């Protein structure tokens, strides 16, 4: 049980997908202008990453490896992710039309989010078991959501701050992301993976 807890904490804080592995930067920068949009995208991405991580592990273990179709791994993972995203989009549209409108084009773009594909591929490359894949996928998603929500809160405060003209917009956003990355480096001694 402690192994799963260490894997979770290590994935969320120490090896964060956005700030350490630099995966998922497009939605990180694009959806983080408003806090409520970032929270909604975080929930949707958490669901998709966790389910896609489990589904891709199952596909690899029970279909691709036994049939020696490893060359189709990336393509099949993208297909699994696309199916999970479509399912998520249907659920969000039915349960929260406001959130569906707020997320707009970013919800279907979860399919091309490199963090979602990255967690599926890293699970296989690190030879995780089923439970480790589920914990790793959930931890990566929680870390992604945590960083996106924190970044959105900071960007909302920066929108009303007195920032010099050359630094407004994406410039201050990238500087802020860099400072957040430095702050998360403080967790590097927390868990040895």
UniProtKB/Swiss-Prot annotation:
**How does the UniProt record describe the way this protein sits in the membrane?**
Multi-pass membrane protein
Principal localization?
A: membrane
In the record, biological process GO terms are:
electron transport chain
Could you list this entry's UniProt keywords, alphabetically sorted. Cell inner membrane, Cell membrane, Electron transport, Membrane, Translocase, Transmembrane, Transmembrane helix, Transport
Is Isomerase tagged as a keyword?
A: no
Q: Does the UniProt entry include the keyword Nucleus?
A: no
What does the record give as EC number? 7.-.-.-
Listed Pfam families: Rnf-Nqr
Q: Name one GO cellular component term.
A: plasma membrane
Q: Where are the transmembrane segments?
A: 5-25, 39-59, 62-82, 102-122, 134-154, 171-191
Family under the similarity heading: Belongs to the NqrDE/RnfAE family.
Q: Outline what the protein does.
A: Part of a membrane-bound complex that couples electron transfer with translocation of ions across the membrane.
Protein name stated in the entry: Ion-translocating oxidoreductase complex subunit A
